[in-house]
Amino acid sequence: MALVKGVAQSQTRPLAFHGEQWTPRALFTVFGAFRASKDYAKLIEFLTNNFACYVKNKTFNFAGTGHLFHSLYAFVPNVSELVKERKQIRLQIDCVMRLFKNTTNDFKMYVELFAFIDAHGGAECPCLLLQQSKLNAVSFVENLNCKLFDIKPPKFKKEPFDSILSKYSLNYKALCFKKKEKCTVGCVTKRQKKMKRRQLLSDRVIYLHNKNDVLDERTLLHGPSGTSLAPCLHRYATVERQTRAGDEMVSFIRYCELCQMRA
């Protein structure tokens, strides 16, 4: 099979195409007919005979095919960068049947988007329209996050085909906001898990106020904590404290000037 300008060209093309090279639009018509007839065995035979170079061990690989087979599984770009484009499908009847069943609504959306392309032109594959709508939504959310208070908020740019996307519950703007909310919640959760590590072991001596005092070893507590304790040599003082504001009644408090312990 030869490649002409990035589009696959079969060596054994059906007569219906009269020698023309394969295009995403032509294959969309073929795949639509197979979906309608539910003849999955014929579809597998069609892919095997016409695109044998992409078949290996009963697996059809999409690597290097561009937009050619997007209508086979109705590719819809995802907001998350973690969800990648499909790379292959298993050429078995149950696998193809499951694929078609899971992408029924997406293929119906492709039908209307191809009709829009036929009427207005400008795109080779419906996924390019979906990608354009996705980029508009991402740009709108980013500009909204960076807007200043003295500037009017940006307006969301709607495309003529956005009504088709809304019909099939595909709203990239809402998905971008939902992704931003999940990211914010994840960041907050991660921030809450941060804990400051404190040094528990210490070689300090507590209540050692007079450096000239020599302490007996028997008065020191040597424990696994690594901290030594020495008794405080209390030096008491008495102060007057007013109990309430504006009240003449006072209390006499006796406390240690060294360790602040009350008598």
From Swiss-Prot:
Question: InterPro entries of this UniProt entry?
Answer: Baculo_LEF5_C, Baculo_LEF5_N
Q: What does this protein do?
A: Required for late and very late gene expression.
Q: Taxonomically, which superkingdom?
A: Viruses
* Family listed: Belongs to the baculoviridae LEF-5 family.
Record's signal peptide? none
What is the designated name of this protein? Late expression factor 5
Source organism: Orgyia pseudotsugata multicapsid polyhedrosis virus (OpMNPV)
Which keywords belong to this entry? Answer: Transcription, Transcription regulation
Gene name tied to this protein: LEF-5
| Record GO biological process | regulation of DNA-templated transcription
